[in-house]
């Protein structure tokens, strides 16, 4: 065991194994006009929002950016542009461990539905970390919390019809 650790540390020092990212990022890809790679610093420069959730009797205040604002920044059609072929688009949110959840593009547009989804980077005033990951989605109106995905690393926009 001790030998393995020394080998691992030696390979890292030699640059043969990558060190962990010091600045986690979120990729926004797929059917977008401009693919994005966002850091916590990038999100901090965008308009902020707060959502309060209750789970297991505990309240949490999440702070972040509305997901539709991130999609808008990537050039995804929303608002009056979300019609016709664009309505057949959906979004896959993917976590670091491969867990995925899906939203129709209409579900993410506040002009279609009153269920804004938060891309959170802080909870109760502190940056998310550890098991939460650096980014997570908070879906306050979903009854089960299964789509409030944590450890978020990628958002992919997919168009069903070509």
Question: Residues of each region from the PLM?
Answer:
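Hydrophobic h-region of N-terminal signal peptides that target proteins for export
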Residues: 10-20
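N-terminal intrinsically disordered, low-complexity segments enriched in P/E/S/T
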Residues: 2, 20-162
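N-terminal secretory signal peptides and thylakoid transit peptides that target proteins
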Residues: 1-12
């Amino acid at each position: 065991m001790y030998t393995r650790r020394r080998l691992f540390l030696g390979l890292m020092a030699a640059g043969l194994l990558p060190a962990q990212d010091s600045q986690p990022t979120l990729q926004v890809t797929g059917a977008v006009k401009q693919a994005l790679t966002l850091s916590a610093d990038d999100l901090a420069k965008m308009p902020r929002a707060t959502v309060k959730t209750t789970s297991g009797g505990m309240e949490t205040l999440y702070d972040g950016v509305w997901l539709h604002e991130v999609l808008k920044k990537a050039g995804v059609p929303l608002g009056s542009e979300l019609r016709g072929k664009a309505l057949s688009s959906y979004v896959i949110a993917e976590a670091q461990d491969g867990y995925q959840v899906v939203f129709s593009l209409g579900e993410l547009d506040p002009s279609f539905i009153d269920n804004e989804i938060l891309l959170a980077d802080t909870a109760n005033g502190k940056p998310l970390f550890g098991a939460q990951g650096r980014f997570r989605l908070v879906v306050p109106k979903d009854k089960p919390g299964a789509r409030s995905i944590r450890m978020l690393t990628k958002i992919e926009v997919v168009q069903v019809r070509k």
